[in-house]
C-alpha cells in the first residue's frame, strides 16, 4: 500500500485523485490533505479518508474547520496558511505527494516535499514552468522522482518507457483547440466567461479551461516538456487533435512515432503517476477505436492563439522569464474571470508584461529571484489592466 499526501484536495485534480483512492483502498492511503478554502468539500474528505494532518490555506477559516470535525477521534493535526501547506507536503511517511494546487502557489510546497524525500506526482505544471531552474537541481540532489500527472506529459512519459537514453528526437503535444477551435478570429472580441468555460472534451477547473481556450495551456506545457524531458524548443511541437484521444506522441531517432491513447479522463495520468512503475487494473471504460471514429489533426492557428508563440519565445529566453509569463497569465485569467478585462486582453497584457521584464531577466535565477519576478508580474498586469 502506497502512502499519499494530496495538495489541492478540493480542486478538480484533488477530487479525482480521491476518487482513485476511494476506489482502490488496498493500494493507497491518505497521509495528508491540503486545501484552499472550500470547507464544504474538505470536511467530508477528512471524515472519509482520515488524514493524519490537514492544511487550510485560508487561515481565517481554521476555527470553523476545528469546530466541524471536533467529534473525530483521533483528531488530525490542523495547520493553516502557506507555511501549513508546506508542513503537510513534508509530513510523515507519505511516499508520494500529488500536487494538484493551481498556479505558482504550488511551488513552495513542492520544494518542501522534495526536500523531505517525497516523490512528486506533478499535476501542477506551474511548479516547473516558474521554478524549473530551482526544482530540477533539488530533484537530483534529494534523489526523488518527478512523475508527470497531466495527460500530455504522462503520455510522453509512458511512451518513453523502454526508449534508451538519447533516443528521443521530437515531442508532439496534442491540443483539443479549446472552446474556440471552431470560432473565427474576428468573433473572439465577443467572448464571454461562459463561452470560455465550455471545453469540448475535458472536465477541468476554471483557470485551466480558460488557458485551454487561449492555448496558453499548451504553451506552458511546451515549457514543462522542455524541463521534464530535456529537448530543446525546436523539437517540441503542438498539433491540434480535436478528439483528444491521442494524448501526445514522441518520435525516436529511427523516425518511429509512439503515441499514448485513451478516453479523455484525468484519472488515468494521475493513477499512473501514483502507481508507477506498476499498472493497476481498473474497471474504467476501455477505449473503443470504432466508437472513437476518425482521429484528425491540423496545424494551430497562430493568429487565433498568440499565446503559443509567446510561450515559445519566453521558453527560449529562459531564466526567470517563464515565471513572469506564468504569473502574468494567472493574473490576467483571474481578471477575466472577475469580468474586469476582456478575453483578448489576456494575451495583450501578458505580452506587455514579458516585454517590460526582458531587460531585467537573469540567466540563472535563485528561488528568491523567481518569487520576486512572480510578484512583479502580477502587479504589472494589475496596473496595466487599469489603463
Swiss-Prot record:
It comes from Cyanothece sp. (strain PCC 7425 / ATCC 29141). Coiled coil: none annotated. Belongs to the DXR family. Mn(2+) binds at residues 150, 152, 221. HAMAP family: DXP_reductoisom. The gene is dxr. The keyword Repeat does not apply. It catalyses: 2-C-methyl-D-erythritol 4-phosphate + NADP(+) = 1-deoxy-D-xylulose 5-phosphate + NADPH + H(+). This is 1-deoxy-D-xylulose 5-phosphate reductoisomerase. NADPH binds at residues 10-13, 36-37, 124, 126, 205.
